[in-house]
Regions:
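Short, basic-rich loop-to-helix N-cap that marks the start of a DNA-contacting helix
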Residues: 60-73
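Intrinsically disordered, low-complexity basic tails/linkers immediately adjacent to helix-turn-helix/homeobox/MYB/SANT
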Residues: 75-86
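Short basic helix-loop element that most often maps to the first helix and adjoining turn
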Residues: 27-46
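Residues in the helix-turn-helix
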Residues: 42, 53, 67, 81
Length: 92
């Protein structure tokens, strides 16, 4: 197994064994929208992101950090409240 190397400004470094693939899941975001009674189209307007981007997130697609920050600002939450990184088979 590879030895972790220190990275500037990094609190933690994960070494992912070969063959393990990680994916992004936005299940937390969809639950938060339900809890706050916010529709996806309303989130798009609130955050200033395109409906296509929200659709992409609905398919667990990758979006920029800027998009995530806009959504968090609009919802008054943190990034870890709307997304998580999971082993690939768990995000389906």
């Amino acid at each position: 197994m590879e030895t972790p190397k220190a990275l500037p400004n990094a609190e933690l470094l994960f070494v992912i064994p070969e063959g393990i693939h990680m994916a992004v899941s936005y299940k937390k975001l969809w639950k938060l929208l339900i809890d706050k009674e916010i529709k996806k189209k309303d989130l798009s307007s609130m955050a200033g992101v395109s409906p296509a981007t929200i659709t992409k997130m609905g398919k667990n697609g990758h979006v920029t950090t800027e998009v995530l920050l806009k959504i968090c600002t609009a919802l008054g939450c943190r990034i870890e409240d709307i997304m998580e990184v999971v082993p690939e088979q768990q995000h389906l």
